[in-house]
Amino acid sequence: MRWLITGAAGMLGRELVRRLAENEEDVAALGHDHLDVTRPSAVRAALAEHRPGIVVNCAAYTAVDDAETDEAAAALLNAEAPRLLAEGLRPHRRHGLVHLSTDYVFPGDARTPYAEDHPTAPRSAYGRTKRDGEQAVLTALPTATVLRTAWLYGRTGRSFVRTMIEREARGGAIDVVADQRGQPTWTGDLADRIIAVGRHPGVHGILHATNAGSATWYDLAQEVFRLLDADPGRVRPTTGAAFRRPAPRPAYSVLGHDRWRGTGLAPLRDWRSALREAFPDILAAEHPPTRRGAA
């Protein structure tokens, strides 16, 4: 089976392609330079050329604040492009689609984890476009799988974890938001779960693909400092109001994982366990070894 990965140059896309290659899977890895998923003719041509057994859509507009002033651009990539992919795959019933979505489709005012079937009510332009993308995919291709995830970090790309590593190296104290709660999620675990879903063609609909447990940004920053053998007391709690941004951030965006029970697949493990395993690779990517004889 051939896998076609859109957004293959992004943080999640790179990790997914790497793990598929390690498993000796047949992969067509297409970044934006190779496939503009917003162009109908380009999508049709890519599907015809590569003839994938499954498509994983990692392409997304993720500039949450910029979307507030350019919702049309966000909608093009987050809603229209997924629709094009789903419609392109619809005539080929044996071909599957895994589409990545976000916790931002919920309002973020709950006190218990959001179930997969909880009504969506996004409060940001970014969240609205991702909600519209989910609906477009499942309308055009009911056999598709939508995986909602959140708070991603990985060995490459920008993330909160990498930012905390850099801030710790500068020394001194740092103020971190302690009144927003979510689920830090490692791209390695998410990539493994995407592969598992792709190999189980009976898994359809919406699933929540975040690492288990929950944390505030403050909790996550302290854990990063501990893994660096630094004093977590240097991380000071503050409120989200101290960092004013154009787009509202969810105060509570913990996702429930109940639907995994009916799939035969396990949900992702606890976020602390995942972070501990991922950390050496993140540090290695942050400070790659110098080749002998290199200038």
From Swiss-Prot:
**Cofactor(s) demanded:** Mg(2+)
Q: What superkingdom does the record give?
A: Bacteria
Please name the GO terms that the record assigns under molecular function.
Answer: dTDP-4-dehydrorhamnose reductase activity; metal ion binding
Annotated active site residues, numbered on this chain, are 126 (proton donor/acceptor)
Query: Which UniProt keyword terms apply here?
Result: Antibiotic biosynthesis, Magnesium, Metal-binding, NAD, NADP, Oxidoreductase
**Which residues are marked as site: Could provide a fine-tuning to achieve optimal pKa matching between active site and substrate?**
102
Kindly state what the record says about how the cofactor is bound: Binds 1 Mg(2+) ion per monomer.
InterPro entries recorded: dTDP_dehydrorham_reduct (IPR005913), NAD(P)-bd_dom_sf (IPR036291), RmlD-like-bd (IPR029903)
Its GO biological process annotations read:
antibiotic biosynthetic process; dTDP-rhamnose biosynthetic process
Q: Which Pfam families match?
A: RmlD_sub_bind (PF04321)
Positions with a binding annotation for NADH: 10-12, 36-37, 60-62, 126, 130
Matches recorded under PANTHER family: DTDP-4-DEHYDRORHAMNOSE REDUCTASE (PTHR10491), METHIONINE ADENOSYLTRANSFERASE 2 SUBUNIT BETA (PTHR10491:SF4)
The similarity annotation says: Belongs to the dTDP-4-dehydrorhamnose reductase family.
Free-text function comment from the UniProt entry: Involved in the biosynthesis of one of the two 2,6-deoxysugars, dTDP-L-oleandrose, attached to the macrolactone ring oleandolide to produce the aglycone antibiotic oleandomycin. Probably catalyzes the reduction of dTDP-4-keto-2,6-dideoxy-beta-L-galactose to yield dTDP-L-olivose.
- State the name under which the record lists this protein: Probable dTDP-4,6-dihydroxy-2-methyloxan-3-one 4-ketoreductase
Which gene is this protein's source? Answer: oleU
